[in-house]
Amino acid sequence: MDIIWSNGCYDILHRGHLELLKYARSLGDKLVVGIDSDKKVRKSKGEGRPVNNQDDRKFFLESLIYVDEVVIFNTPKELEGRVESIRPKFIVIGCLLYTSPSPRD
């Protein structure tokens, strides 16, 4: 099974997000989306953010047909651990596409 990973804050979900997720899902069999915790979004984007809390953002993404699983992370170490555990074939972030650095079993 080819797993695809995408992550971001996904606050104020818009057409660009949806197009990205649709494209990401087309690359494999399962799309896992990581979202920044409220604390992480506030730290990077400032007070008043996120507009939608992490539970709502998770719910919105889980409601999309392109998304198979959503996880919330708070630190770069948590993000790294999650990506290492699922070993995605591709990582899609914004307009960037990364391939796995080594063959998967």
Give the label of every model feature segment:
Residues 98-105:
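Conserved small/polar residues in nucleotide/adenosyl-binding loops
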